[in-house]
UniProtKB/Swiss-Prot annotation:
Involved in the biogenesis of peroxisomes. It comes from the Eukaryota. It comes from Schizosaccharomyces pombe (strain 972 / ATCC 24843). Keywords: Membrane, Peroxisome, Peroxisome biogenesis, Phosphoprotein. Pfam families: Pex16. It is a peripheral membrane protein. It is found in: Peroxisome membrane. This is Peroxisomal membrane protein PEX16. GO terms for cellular component: peroxisomal membrane.
Length: 364
């Protein structure tokens, strides 16, 4: 596509690529607030716009990493975090890892808009579609676990801009300047000219700490203990098991007048999470010696925090459960003289913003 190629060339032609990308995304985010109210109030339109902006953000991130790949490997190590090196290692090891990760990311940000579309035009198929999407995401996560030797899939399994902006601009400017760099004829490598290189002592002092950020491949090849793999598998199963129970409850509800809220799926999901956390604590001493364990520990913590948010807001049933009890608990506020009405309006506004947040959390 010529327009897309032209767009990429304009973004990547100089060292200000990152600033251009950030400015474009910021302008588009501001433009979303200028849309008519129907786009912001309508949940389907709002979620669709959010998903499109996230996809554009990830497209720009891919372009920036393409620019980083043009630098020498020693300079790339300055910009690439442990998380980035982890993803790139498995991308090289298994060609399907990148496609599976991108597909999982796309499904994560598009599941809720897809569900809204189906619930609007074919409500009877809403739970069937969500169960199908959760099944596909489950298979993708299991594939990632198999590729990485049992690691828990990252909540965002694609590259992120976790590098220093000033360093990125400085290095890009340094190696794009023909006066400070030269391309070797045989290897086509870009190296700095001799007159731009510091003395050997300065070079060692400046480069040694940077080279220490390069992680050897061996830290990613070591397999996790079986118990930790089982714990990660429980976490991967939890969303699918929860949705399977809810799908069964919905079918049962259609065939009878049952209107009682099902606590069973929530309790099962909570038990799954508690079991996995107990296993993690037991295996922590065994895995703490594994290099790169910090990334796995941060992943487990973020997954658990996400689960806590979902658990306390009752997941996808916020509207019919949490909202009901909030309204009942605040029914007395309106009876307060003078300030009661204004306080109730303030609480309702806060509740509306909470609803919008919970709808973005979805069912994971």
């Amino acid at each position: 596509m010529k327009p897309l190629a032209y767009y990429e060339d304009q973004l990547l032609k100089d060292e200000k690529s990152f600033l251009k990308v950030t400015e474009i995304e910021r302008l588009l985010s501001y433009a979303a607030y200028l849309l008519p109210a129907e786009f912001r109030d309508d949940q389907l339109k709002s979620q669709t716009i959010t998903s499109i902006l996230l996809l554009l953000h990830q497209f720009h991130t891919g372009l920036l990493f393409r620019k980083i790949a043009e630098l020498p490997k020693t300079e790339q190590a300055i910009l690439k975090s442990e998380r980035t090196q982890y993803l790139e290692y498995f991308r090289k090891k298994n060609p399907s890892f990148e496609k599976v990760s991108e597909l999982l990311y796309f499904l994560n940000i598009s599941t809720f808009p897809i569900e809204l579309v189906i619930s609007k035009y074919n409500p009877s198929r809403q739970y069937d579609s969500v169960l199908f999407l959760e099944s596909v995401k489950f298979l993708l996560r299991v594939h990632i676990m198999w590729t990485t030797g049992g690691d828990l899939p990252l909540s965002n399994p694609v590259l992120q801009r976790d590098f220093n902006v000033k360093t990125f601009i400085h290095l890009h400017k340094k190696y794009s300047n023909s006066g400070s760099a030269v391309v070797l004829k045989n290897s086509k490598k870009v190296v700095p000219r001799l007159n731009t290189v510091n003395s050997s002592l300065d070079f060692l002092q400046n480069r040694t700490p940077r080279l220490s950020s390069i992680l050897p491949d061996e830290i990613f090849t070591k397999r996790l203990p079986n118990l930790r793999i089982f714990s990660n598998f429980i976490k991967v199963c939890r969303p699918l098991i929860y949705m399977l129970f809810m799908w069964h409850w919905k079918r049962k509800q259609k065939s009878s007048s049952l209107k009682v809220r099902p606590w069973g799926p929530w309790i099962v999901a909570f038990v799954f999470e508690v079991i996995s956390q107990l296993i993690d604590r037991r295996c922590e001493s065994a895995t703490s010696s594994r290099q790169g364990f910090g990334l796995e520990r941060r992943t487990n913590q973020s997954q658990f925090q996400h689960f806590v948010v979902w658990a306390f807001t009752q997941g996808r049933f916020y509207d019919e459960f949490t909202k009901h009890w909030i309204n009942r608990s605040l029914s007395w506020v309106n009876s307060i003289p003078v300030f009661g009405k204004y306080l109730l309006l303030s609480v309702e506004e806060r509740q509306k913003s909470l609803e919008n947040y919970i709808s973005s959390v979805r069912n994971y």
